[in-house]
């Protein structure tokens, strides 16, 4: 069992899945050939250590016959939202080298792909040496033959004026922004550790709409977060009415074992 599932469910796998011989987390993949080449595996092999440095810099996926290529530019997250397991399964933030990203994008274009989606658990917190996300976005935009560029998922706290300016400057950057709100109540946002208020979020969304005419804005909403009241939910609706999102991904809260918040208030059922 490999990847995030191995990272988050290793104890359950050990206790209840005796047929599992190897449990490897997402940052231990380089050891896999050595492990598989062992003649005998008599005991379970487990390696779920997380690295502060592993950024998958030298791995270029093989792509065939497509339009959109997904290109990971960073891994992990430092935000520690209380509902999210990503920092515990993917580790802390680390970014790929800018030149490595550009080489992968260029190879995808050479292979016939016309659209690129830049990926990261917190994509706009990208930082490699002196380059930030807006620097990378601009360099990718200059690649000949690349018709469309998207990126996901950004964090509102890291959405900078520089990113908005670059989006406005280059026609091949799609005029759309995914801006996860999660909740519209400041009390719930604080419990979620989202590090912004609803007023700051509305101001950011309106700035994006003013500076990027006809921009499409989508969002994520969590409903039924522990302790959420009807009043809290009504405030979420107020933000949605103020911003007028083009699309919203709505999710009922579900607890993730191992997240940093020990919930003491029950999750609303209705």
Predicted regions and their residues:
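Short beta-alpha connecting loops at secondary-structure transitions
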Residues: 190, 261-262
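Hydrophobic alpha-helix-in-membranes signature
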Residues: 86, 153-155, 225, 254, ...
